[in-house]
From Swiss-Prot:
Organism of derivation: Homo sapiens
Domain EF-hand: from-to ranges: 196-231
Superkingdom of origin organism: Eukaryota
Protein name (record): EF-hand calcium-binding domain-containing protein 12
Residue positions binding Ca(2+): E212
GO molecular function, one term: calcium ion binding
Length: 572
């Protein structure tokens, strides 16, 4: 045994190339001993309890349910997994198999039933399935029975479900939904006509004894309806035939269908009559409750004379013809009413009354003069006053815009341009002077100074006396001061009588080209508030000033300049 081991050991070393040769080259050289290396590498294999490692196991513990009752208390089985909803068709062996624990199985089935009922329309879901199980067919049968219990349910659907429900063996049969036509109004007309004539629907066909499922053809039905004399057109009779035949199994009319439809119509008539009777009873009771206190008042009051029933004019609803007044219109109406009441009580003339109204002022002279009422009589006065109020609002808006945009238009400029100076009532010797015309004065005495007018009125004798009484005052001035004084006088007073410019009367005559310039609005000549009429310049001004002016050409336009001034010529 030892010899075999040594032979095997030497063969293994020779294969590894670690065995020393029998004829060593150098006996003193160190020899590699592989035994410790092999013993170290194969140490685990030499142990007695050496075996392969086992695979890891995963154990899942399911919590115990209260409904679960184990058969053996020693060995408690795990609870079955929850049913996973799937759309696969159940096989026969899956249906027959039931778990051992019945309570658990019943709880799972009830839970599945609740989920199915809360899922949505169970009837539609089951009818659209290609194949159903016996339990699903049973549920569908119960749904159809519940619907057939209602009075307004269709008879065709109930009949098909009752026949198809017991057939549980046909699992793969598909439920085809049927269409139901709406009930034509001519059917109720026909039944009401027969009811008023006390004719039964089954008696007109003379087939009562032949059975309820006896079929009635289209020609027989039309002939019977015409024989009774029902007031219907041919198209309406055709609609009734189509509707009644759609309720049958083979698109035919039977006695059973006629009886059922007539019964449904009579029940609907009874419900409507009950509802109307209840409404009439409530209205009558309400009227009696209202008449009770009225009768007591009539008894207490004294007997009155009998009233004559005459024609009364119907009340006209004027709310649609009127409109609500604005605040400005209400204020104007109030002002007119107060003015009328005051004028009836006044003993002074109206023009003096208007002058008294002028005493109420706001403090700003321009505003007061603009807002004065006009002295013109008639309708023109109201138009002028409304125009002045409108212009005052325009002035306020322009002032706000100029202030917000920062335009260099002062308040004085806007007042001169937009506000009217107003009519001024002036008394002279207890007489009202006429309104000043453009370019003139109220009277001639204003042209002269007040001292000269006073002297003229007194006469020549009185004027001499006044000259004697008033001493002359002399003042010395230099030549330059006298020259400036005379220059100012020439500017103030022109030659001859004083004449005013015709445009001086109109507001804004000092503002030639006034317009509101806004940064966001393009410049437009039509926005000018006032335009001054001026003479157009001559086409060739050089012809009228040949001595001083001469046309000079600079590039592409012509300029007029003094010919003696310094000139710079450009040669293009």
């Amino acid at each position: 045994m030892d010899d075999d081991y040594e032979a095997y050991h030497s063969l293994f070393l020779s294969l590894l190339g670690l065995c020393p040769s029998k004829t060593p080259i150098n006996e003193n050289a160190p020899v590699f001993d592989p035994e410790p290396v092999i013993a170290h590498c194969f140490k685990q294999f030499q142990q007695k309890d050496f075996r392969l490692p086992q695979t890891r196991r995963r154990i899942i513990m399911v919590p115990r349910k209260e409904d679960q009752t184990p058969l053996n208390p020693a060995s408690q089985p795990q609870a079955p997994p929850k049913p996973i909803p799937s759309f696969k068709v159940l096989e026969a062996r899956d249906i027959q198999e039931q778990p051992e624990d019945r309570k658990t199985w019943l709880s799972q089935r009830s839970k599945l039933r609740q989920e199915l009922e809360s899922f949505g329309d169970v009837k539609r879901w089951l009818e659209n399935k290609p194949s159903i199980t016996p339990s699903e067919a049973k549920v569908l049968h119960m749904i159809h029975e519940e619907q057939s219990a209602q009075p307004n349910a269709s008879q065709a659907t109930t009949r098909t479900t009752r026949k198809k429900a017991p057939r549980l063996s046909r699992l793969s049969r598909q439920m085809v939904p049927q269409l139901q036509l709406p009930e034509p109004p001519a059917l109720s007309v026909m039944y009401s006509y027969l009811h008023s004539r006390k004719i039964k629907i089954l008696e007109i066909f003379h087939k009562v004894g032949q059975g309820e499922n006896q079929r009635i053809t289209r020609e027989e039905f039309i002939a019977a309806v015409k024989a009774v004399g029902v007031p219907l057109k041919n198209q309406e009779v055709e609609d009734i035939v189509i509707y009644l035949s759609s309720l049958g199994k083979h698109n035919t009319i039977t006695m059973d269908i006629l009886a059922n439809t007539y019964k449904q119509w009579s029940m609907a008539q009874q419900r409507s009559s009950l509802a109307t009777a209840r409404e009439h009873y409530i209205l009558a009771k309400h009227r009696d409750s209202l008449k009770g206190p009225l009768k007591k008042q009539e008894v207490d009051s004294a007997p009155q004379l009998p009233k004559v029933d005459l024609l009364t004019v119907p009340a006209v609803d004027t709310q649609m013809e009127t409109r609500p007044m604005t605040l400005e219109e209400m204020e104007e109406v109030g002002k007119r009413y107060r003015e009328r009441q005051r004028q009836h009580k006044l003993t002074i003339p109206s023009i003096q009354y208007t002058e008294q109204c002028h005493l109420v002022r706001c403090g700003n002279r321009h505003f007061d003069e603009h807002c004065l009422p006009s002295t013109i009589h008639g309708d023109m006065r109201e138009l002028i006053d409304s125009a002045r109020r409108h212009n005052f609002l325009v002035y306020l808006q322009c002032w706000k815009l100029c202030k917000s945009y920062g335009l260099p238009l002062t308040e004085d400029i806007l007042m001169k341009a937009l506000l009217y100076p107003g009519d001024k009532i002036i008394f002279q010797m207890d007489k009202v002077c006429p309104i000043r015309q453009p370019g003139g004065y109220y009277s001639d005495w204003k042209v002269f100074s007040p001292n000269l007018a006073l002297l003229r009125s007194q006469g020549p004798g009185k004027s001499k006396r006044t000259d004697k009484k008033t001493p002359k005052k002399s003042k010395k001035m230099r030549f330059k001061e006298f020259e400036e004084f005379t220059r100012k006088l020439k500017v103030k007073r022109s030659s001859g009588l004083q004449q005013t410019h015709p445009n001086s009367f109109w507001p804004g005559h000092l503002l030639d080209k006034l317009q509101l310039y806004l940064p966001t609005v393009a410049t437009d000549r039509s926005l000018a508030l006032f335009s001054c009429v001026q003479h157009q310049p001559h086409v060739y001004p050089a012809t009228y000033h040949p001595d001083h002016w001469w046309p000079l050409r600079n590039k592409n336009y012509m300029t007029h300049a003094h010919y003696d001034a310094a000139k710079v010529y450009y040669i293009n």
